[in-house]
């Protein structure tokens, strides 16, 4: 929430984010996904937001505050726009993990621990067991692990038992620390993460 407040106070708007994505998409061919809150989508107009996201080159949408039971409010519109509504799976019962995984699109975001996003010194959840349950229900769906991954060692550990590691808050903190000069430190950090993740091979 702190990062969101700073973005808003800095003049960031949804349309400005769309413009940034449009420019990035001109040089980047990798899939790109928005992670935002449902109220951002609602306030822009759900269908309008999703159509615009697809237009500028977004491939999927993660709404961490929308539980599985409420996803049908967004899923048909995402499908119509050509976007994957990405499922998040937290440490929970085996039956629930399999239920969510069975209908997952794009990839599954495996939440490493309960709580809010951010940097953690240690991740204790048995991610390997979660991933195995997901694959039992949906063998072809990729699983990426997020929440609390901030170091190359953590990324390597998570990638060893899943298909990838998601890093967010650590990069935002580099933006906060270096401001307009953040591109270099971010690039260095991402490269170190990439090297660590590839160690699993």
Region roles according to the model:
Residues 31-45, 86-92, 120:
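Active-site mouth loops of central-metabolism enzymes
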Residues 9-22, 42-47, 63-80, 93-99, ...:
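Active-site-adjacent beta->alpha loops and helix N-cap segments on the catalytic face
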Residues 1-2:
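Short, small-residue-biased leader/transition segments that mark boundaries at the very start
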Residues 92-102, 137-138, 149-165:
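Catalytic cores of alpha/beta
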Residues 173-201:
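C-terminal helical cap(s) of enzyme catalytic domains, especially alpha/beta-barrels
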Residues 53, 100, 158, 168, ...:
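Conserved, mostly hydrophobic/aromatic
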